[in-house]
Amino acid sequence: MQTKKELDFNQAKEKALRYLEFRSHSEKELSDKLKRAGAKEHDIESVLEFLKSYNFINDHSFAEKYAHDLIVLKKFGKNRVKLELSKKGIASDIICEVLENFDWETEDILTPLVSKKLAGDFQKKSIDRCIRYFLYKGYSYDEIKTSIDKIKTEEEYDI
């Protein structure tokens, strides 16, 4: 069995910079990766301080970019975005601030998605499946129900 080689400060710093070449990371993500690579706790803290001093890592800007990608590309709702950001080790106050500053109308995003998912099928089984799917995506029950009701109304009156 091969034991992990311990990394000193310079090796840990190089490894962290290599990780950051590919994509931005949160502090916690980078810390966890360096721990797994074999860096000592005090070296990890020093590396993180070094990276913060040069603004290579910034949890607030990381959270903004990541939340934007989750909302725009993956069409996640606020609840799922909160969960994903907390998994990345972002502080709850930063998460709340990022979500407050993000300008989006849930109904504008959700209604076309629900319409596509239902595709005119308003049977109870299809609606329940649709609700479960969008709850998983992070939307609230009320938001989903409002979108379904709006689509039903549009279908009835062919708006």
Residue map of PLM features:
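An alpha-helical, amphipathic repeat domain used for nucleic-acid recognition
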Residues: 1-159
